[in-house]
Amino acid sequence: MAKVRAPFEIIGTLDDLTFYKSSGQNLVREKGKPGITKEQFATSEIFIPIKKHGIEYGYCSLKSRVFRLLAKQFYDRAKEVSFAGRVNKLLFEILEEDTLNQRGERKLEIGLQIPALDEILLHFEANKLRPLDKVCYKNITFDWHENTINLNSINVDKDINWPEVEANRIHFQLAIANWNCKEDAFENHYSNEIILERSNAESLLEFQLNKLQTKDLW
């Protein structure tokens, strides 16, 4: 970029130079060098890996729309702004486990069959700001045979990490879901909601939760 000093003002282009006005000054700069053309991107083998990555990531983004509905009531309450992006990343990690198809053609239903799937999904938090293990001091697991968690009572004053001193009420609710990613279908159930006031006393946790009729993930 250079400044034009002349008794007249120049605006426009001359060969490789562009004259323009900015902040009351007459300036000149060289035209930018042309980047990659549409034709080059479409035909050059250099860009094949980029295009395949884009195809797969777009595929995961579409599938994530249904995934985000599995426990939508909880996700909406969390209001965690990075949730959608983290779901896309999670599904892409699962997609990469498909070793049967070549890159650009891999499928989630194949990646979901890996033995380590439980480890990947169980440690995914919809609300990374307040993950379950940071909220409750007790270890919570879900028993699929009994259709409930391993806790039947809790002392909310001692067992809960309250976000602030003024907080005095806590809501407990369970949700279970099955996801058929191939058909973009899902089934989910929510339990009754248990609301407890903050107190140093043991309170019962009695959930009623319908069992799932479909089992595509296990």
Predicted regions and their residues:
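Charged linear interaction tracts used for macromolecular binding and regulation
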Residues: 93-218
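Long, polar/Ser/Thr-enriched low-complexity segments
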Residues: 1-128
